[in-house]
Amino acid sequence: MTEIANGQQILPPDYTLKEPEPEHCPGPESENAGKGDSCQGCANKEVCESLPKGPDPDLPLIKENLANIKHKILILSGKGGVGKSTFTTMLSWALSADEDLQVGAMDLDICGPSLPHMLGCVRETIHESNTGWTPVYVTDNLATMSIQYMLPDTDSAIIWRGSKKNALIKKFLKDVDWDYLDYLLIDTPPGTSDEHISINNYLKESQIDGALIVTTPQEVALLDVRKEINFCRKAGINILGLVENMSGFVCPNCKGESKIFKATTGGGKALCNELGIDFLGSVPLDPRIGRCCETGESFLDEFPDSPASTAILEVIESLRDAVGDV
């Protein structure tokens, strides 16, 4: 069993800090390490300046470890609370419903992991072998990896700065033994944080298919999605498309639809038309989605006749078409 206990890091750090890095630390692998404005007066300045620069020697190892994964997809959102992890969960269930597909779900939200709970395997732990870390299998063809499996209990908090989170992300990408997968879904934190920069850097040589972006219809969510799209374009990440979650509520009794989050500026579809990206579809609200995520059950199996189930399957067909897997 691999575990983080008492808030300690299980991995040897990439470097030894004299004190926690400052808020705007450029990172030890940056060309500006030890030279940036935030480095002045930092006790770690000399340590960072002395570190080797240039290509990360672990990138070829990450590429080799992920070589047997056919499709690698990042799941992104500009704002928290739009249902990104929920959608990742439903996407995992839907793809793995095809017994001919091998699916993996990697939870890289280090400080707020939720996939283990939503997939019904929160009490599991990671085991090591001579081939690396063995992922937790939800079903015979659905595997998952998360920091939650390394914590002593579900209430344990991860209070890490960037370097520790980045080291674990690299460990997940380099040392988890996925074997062969048709799909690896990578659930990321909301926003454009340190983790996103690291994920992009670590996967540069691994030929990811791109990113699926999740939003809700209201402008306050779309404002942050614009930033996410801008980040992807600057980072060279292919945008596979956008999904509008919680687009409406269909009453299970009268079948009438209500707009809970109103698309005051046209919603996700209008944004896609404006910015020239593919709109993969809208998924309506269904309270039973939350119930299934609480119990770790597949919403698509439990409620196949729900309008949300139909919409999710249509989105997945569009996604498979976008990655050339039809």
From Swiss-Prot:
GO cellular component: cytosol; nucleus
Binding positions ([4Fe-4S] cluster 2): 251, 254
Residues reported to bind [4Fe-4S] cluster 1: 25, 39, 42, 48
Entry-linked Gene3D superfamilies: P-loop containing nucleotide triphosphate hydrolases
SUPFAM superfamilies: P-loop containing nucleoside triphosphate hydrolases (SSF52540)
Biological process annotations from GO: iron-sulfur cluster assembly
Region (Disordered): 1-38
Record's compositionally biased regions (Basic and acidic residues): 16-26
UniProt function note: Component of the cytosolic iron-sulfur (Fe/S) protein assembly (CIA) machinery. Required for maturation of extramitochondrial Fe-S proteins. The NBP35-CFD1 heterotetramer forms a Fe-S scaffold complex, mediating the de novo assembly of an Fe-S cluster and its transfer to target apoproteins. Required for biogenesis and export of both ribosomal subunits, which may reflect a role in assembly of the Fe/S clusters in RLI1, a protein which performs rRNA processing and ribosome export.
Quaternary structure (record): Heterotetramer of 2 NBP35 and 2 CFD1 chains.
Protein name: Cytosolic Fe-S cluster assembly factor NBP35
Lineage of origin: Eukaryota, Fungi, Dikarya, Ascomycota, Saccharomycotina
